[in-house]
Amino acid sequence: MYEFDWSSIVPSLPYLLDGLVITLKITVTAVVIGILWGTMLAVMRLSSFAPVAWFAKAYVNVFRSIPLVMVLLWFYLIVPGFLQNVLGLSPKNDIRLISAMVAFSMFEAAYYSEIIRAGIQSISRGQSSAALALGMTHWQSMKLIILPQAFRAMVPLLLTQGIVLFQDTSLVYVLSLADFFRTASTIGERDGTQVEMILFAGFVYFVISLSASLLVSYLKRRTA
């Protein structure tokens, strides 16, 4: 019968916390940039100017049709060359974390865009017409009238997508980036406690995701 050995967890906590910080950095960065870029894409897709709408639609369709792990690898290969040529960074600089942040931000923006677009379309067109009648421009009505109402209703959905993003960050193992999951796995391989460390990592992901889910449920009740 297998005997669990949890003794390596406590001594490894500093390394695990460092890995968790990297995971949270990727998550927070991708959520913030993803929502900002996703909002722009949503507005562009609703534009009456066809080329702009086509670009936004093509962007969303492309990123939603490609596996995330492939996007991570693409940006891992593209971003270093871009930064070296534009910013003059040395090839020796480790920019795996930046590559991961860019990849997740661009990928998640496609999903946030659809959430935000649906939120905008849920607002009565009468409000936009009333704003235009008062002398506001289209962009002013979008900024001051439509988006604030749409975001209030969308907060639970945006946070839910953020939870999915947090769980997906474990895929950065393909970049050999020492996030929380990879750190736990590496420690398990080193100490011969692979099962225990993976179970512990899963428990931490569960606790954080459950806490965030409870927050989402609370916000849903508040915004209902």
Curated annotation (Swiss-Prot):
An annotated Gene Ontology molecular function: transmembrane transporter activity
Signal peptide range: none
Primary residence: membrane
Keyword Acyltransferase among UniProt keywords: no
GO cellular component: ATP-binding cassette (ABC) transporter complex, substrate-binding subunit-containing; membrane; plasma membrane
Compartments in which it is found: Cell inner membrane
Deletion phenotype: Disruption confers resistance to cellular contact-dependent growth inhibition (CDI) CdiA of P.luminescens strain TTO1, but not to several other tested CdiA toxins.
GO biological process entries: amino acid transport; L-aspartate import across plasma membrane; L-glutamate import across plasma membrane
Domain of life: Bacteria
Topology feature Cytoplasmic, residues: 41-67, 113-154, 218-224
TM segment ranges: 20-40, 68-88, 95-112, 155-175, 197-217
Keywords for the protein's UniProt record, in alphabetical order: Amino-acid transport, Cell inner membrane, Cell membrane, Membrane, Transmembrane, Transmembrane helix, Transport
Topological domain ranges for the Periplasmic compartment: 1-19, 89-94, 176-196
Bilayer disposition of the protein: Multi-pass membrane protein
Domain ABC transmembrane type-1 residue range list: 20-216
Subunit and partners: The complex is composed of two ATP-binding proteins (GltL), two transmembrane proteins (GltJ and GltK) and a solute-binding protein (GltI).
Job of this protein: Part of the ABC transporter complex GltIJKL involved in glutamate and aspartate uptake. Probably responsible for the translocation of the substrate across the membrane.
NCBIfam families according to UniProt: HEQRo_perm_3TM, PRK15107.1
Stored PANTHER family: GLUTAMATE_ASPARTATE IMPORT PERMEASE PROTEIN GLTK, MEMBRANE COMPONENT OF AMINO ACID ABC TRANSPORTER
UniProt similarity note: Belongs to the binding-protein-dependent transport system permease family. HisMQ subfamily.
Protein name in the entry: Glutamate/aspartate import permease protein GltK
Encoding gene, per UniProt annotation: gltK
